[in-house]
């Protein structure tokens, strides 16, 4: 089939390369978000998908208004039979959805109808789900609600960060998307409606929502930290200093100190403990402003934290 591939971040690259390499499909163009400011200088940089497409000689479309009449006409001139989507990052209007005769097929990183929205992997980890996966479905105007073509499942490991899990789903999801498009091209695949029950939402996580709430119990804090690693990144105030946090330790072999109030900090020779709504939690790595990730105990000794300082 003649395909237009729509995607933006690195997560979309396995699917893009798989479709370009497929003998059954012809990726005639890539649709991605406009160049965005990056780095300290704020210089506009192409998206990872744009860079990969250009390296492979695929034309790149970067409309600032993808639902405009002008872009709908531009896409229509390309005459794609189907459009494949992986984390494009913009809502698609009715006119755009009506361009390809086989519609728009989206790869979503959850087992729909669970975790519809922009942050399904993060939501699954934060909720403590044991299993998640990826789903291919036909895009319709409402959010992630279209009929399903296929799914692949993935176990969530106890130490998975969102980055770890998304990396695996990007690879297995690429296989699923390719197989889905093969089935559509052959006329052998029919989408089925999503169940009405089991719908949960996974909106984008803001920086403020990634702030650790120490009054919560340890299992919830630990999952939430993994869920926002690497982006937007867990953080807390230690005194008046904003510090990013890496995944924390849940090691039964290390005896925690006595009870600590939520946010209270205790530093010993090898560990930094913070009080929570349950037992104290041992920090792993921290990233003070302007520095790289480092061992929490090493940082605490160097910073000479006042015994009265708290995390908040």
From Swiss-Prot:
Domain of life according to the entry: Bacteria
Gene: fmt
GO annotations of cellular component type: cytosol
Binding site for (6S)-5,6,7,8-tetrahydrofolate: 110-113
InterPro entries: Fmt, Formyl_trans_C, Formyl_transf_N, Formyl_transf_N_sf, Formyl_transferase-like_C_sf, Met-tRNA-FMT_C, Met-tRNA-FMT_N
Function, as annotated: Attaches a formyl group to the free amino group of methionyl-tRNA(fMet). The formyl group appears to play a dual role in the initiator identity of N-formylmethionyl-tRNA by promoting its recognition by IF2 and preventing the misappropriation of this tRNA by the elongation apparatus.
Homology family: Belongs to the Fmt family.
Gene3D superfamilies linked: 3.40.50.12230
E.C. no: 2.1.2.9
Keywords, alphabetical: Protein biosynthesis, Transferase
Organism in which the protein naturally occurs: Mycobacterium ulcerans (strain Agy99)
Root EC class: transferase
Protein's recorded name: Methionyl-tRNA formyltransferase
